[in-house]
Amino acid sequence: MTSATYIMALDLGTTGNRAILFDQDGQIVDQAYKELPQYYPQPGWVEHDALEIWRDTRWAMETVVTQAHIDPAQIAAIGLTVQRETCLLWDKTTGQPLHKAIVWQDRRTAAYCNQLAEQGHTQDIYDRTGLVLDAYFSGSKLAWLLTEVKRQNPNLNLDNVIAGTIDTWALWNLTGGKVHATDHSNASRTLLLNLSQGTWDDHLLDLFGIPKSFMPAIQPSLGIFGKTDTKFLGQEIPIAAIFGDQQAALFAHGCDRPGALKCTYGTGSFLVAHTGSNIARSKNRLLSTVAWTQTDKGQTQTGYAIEGSMFTSGACIQWLRDGLKLIANAAETEGLAQAVEDNGGVYFVPALSGLGAPHWDMSARGAFLGITRGAQREHMVRAVLEAIAFQTKEVVDAVNQDCGSPIQQLKVDGGACQNNFLMQYQADVLGIPVERPAVLDATAQGAAFGAGLAIGVWKDYAGLVAARKIDQVFKPGANAQTAQANFKTWQKAVERAKNWAD
């Protein structure tokens, strides 16, 4: 490695923003994190303040450098990974957002999406984008934002308006407003990217009423996007990789060939399988998406993936803490779940933001079923953890059907993986081993690996991946049969929770 001995990863997630420093061996040196406030202006609506995201990003960058006692000149590159689909509009002359960012979990555009479906657009949108027509993705959110900001400010000069997902917003700010760009992995989550061409789709921009001038330039995921303005850290540091968070985790796990897959347990759970250089079309309502892109001899090389997106997993645990006040912190859920022999007949449907794959039911809502006078707090907590494992099984079953050859092992990452009860239950219900790495921040690790490889700090991707340490492999145990029987009961509960909201 050169005299610059660190790579910084910026991991801008749904619940918080983090800066992590990695050394030349790909190991974490230090990190700084700040939880991000969530705004719920109406039921089913979720917003973030983009200025808070940027302020916390700056704070995390400066704090991690101070904590690690390093000179910013030693940072060779920055890799950026973000929550996907969350988007905003801002004024490029003032740098001010025109509205709070609409978060991926937000359902305010469900009726608008249903309208488009009734007009017969569903199949065409899937054919062009690989995505289902759902309020989850950015297209309908940007359409809503544009209508709303024009309503609030009829004299708005649209020539000054630009749009982006969180990577684009962060990049624009990091470069002092010089670069308005995104990468293919984030662009593929907007409902506006033509998946086979890798460019913005004019027909879909027209359909959603979004001017092309709003949209960022699309660049390969690995490569120099720009340099940080010297007013941050006093250095021009290349921003050398951008990934959506799930694609970054896929990259960290070394899933770069057909059939290699991982599951990340964050705010939601996301199971992603690489499909090589071909777009795989699911028969089970999984998404086709870009894994990542890179340039080889001047040509853009695209890797694709299929994905099962489950909207609510870690968010359920957060809700137990903040909404129901059943727990003081996430860590205690493990002990509570283990304190009872079973779930006491209680089942939870984690449809707090509707249901994602494989149901795609925007009207589903969360539910506890099977409650009797004997149900205790421990049973409720256990039911929530079991539900996280059950929904992953649904998606693994769908991937198995699509791929034709059953998955032999599940690689996992994300904060909820710290929960040993959840990981063991996941192995039991799947009937296959679950491999947990020592570094659970695979999203940040993937962004760091990508940036370091892009600027030549590292040359050997396979070697980097091979050096990752495994913490534990959970194997199916004595409770596997019971867990699999409970899964069938849980599927009945899911049917009861579907088609609930208008």
From Swiss-Prot:
The record's section on InterPro entries has: ATPase_NBD, Carb_kinase_FGGY, Carb_kinase_FGGY_CS, FGGY_C, FGGY_N, Glycerol_kin
Binding positions (sn-glycerol 3-phosphate):
14, 84-85, 136, 245
Query: Per UniProt, which keywords does this protein have?
Result: ATP-binding, Glycerol metabolism, Kinase, Nucleotide-binding, Transferase
Write down the Gene3D superfamilies for this protein, in alphabetical order.
3.30.420.40
Free-text activity regulation comment from the record? Inhibited by fructose 1,6-bisphosphate (FBP).
> What's the EC number here?
2.7.1.30
- The answer to whether keyword Nucleotide-binding applies is yes
MF annotations from Gene Ontology: ATP binding; glycerol kinase activity
Which Pfam families does the UniProt record give? Answer: FGGY_C, FGGY_N
Q: Has UniProt tagged this entry with the keyword NADP? A: no
| Residues given in the record as ADP binding sites | 14, 18, 267, 314, 415, 419
Q: Which family does it belong to?
A: Belongs to the FGGY kinase family.
Sum up the protein's function in the record's words. Answer: Key enzyme in the regulation of glycerol uptake and metabolism. Catalyzes the phosphorylation of glycerol to yield sn-glycerol 3-phosphate.
Q: Extract the PANTHER family matched here.
A: GLYCEROL KINASE, SUGAR KINASE
User: What is the protein name given in its UniProt record?
Assistant: Glycerol kinase
The source organism is Acaryochloris marina (strain MBIC 11017)
Q: Which gene encodes it?
A: glpK
